[in-house]
Amino acid sequence: MLSNEEIETRYQAEVKQADVDHHTPTAGAMIGHVMANLTIQRRKLRQMKWYAKGINNQAFKAQLTTLLAENDMLLDKTAERLLDEGEVLPTTQAEYTEYGMLTEEPRIKYWDMPAMIAEMIADYNTANLFVSRAIKLAEKEERFALAADMVSLMGYNQHQIRELQSQLGKAAREGLDEEDDD
């Protein structure tokens, strides 16, 4: 059993390494951002499930239930892979707040379902910015299992974007990609 002093020494080493990793990004650090986004996304999906109103709210709530279960599975799978790679995970609310780039919105409870769907699309799209960066870093570091998991997550997110966009009557990338002026 570790003494309090040994625990503190390990924790301070973790904090120091996290600071280094976030100033010179590593695959592990970038995937920490991915985990934080998944955690924030879970809270937002739950909030939407609790407050969805409208003519098709039961179908929407069922969809959210599925997305929540998948989100939990993805978060656990990502955590396990990082542990397999010898990484230290973000686990506290403070870390998720610091590393997450999805924004929480307490007003979601008042939104209609199309606004909630648009928010989910934006979140999956934002999450993919970090996932794509994690893929590049993992490949550069030759951490191929991490890269493979992130490629899988990218595909999952893209599929969710397409499905949600179709619920709004839009094509998969409609309104999401910046237009090239050339």
What kind of region is each of these model predictions?
Residues 1-182:
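Iron-associated oxidoreductase/ferritin-like identity signal
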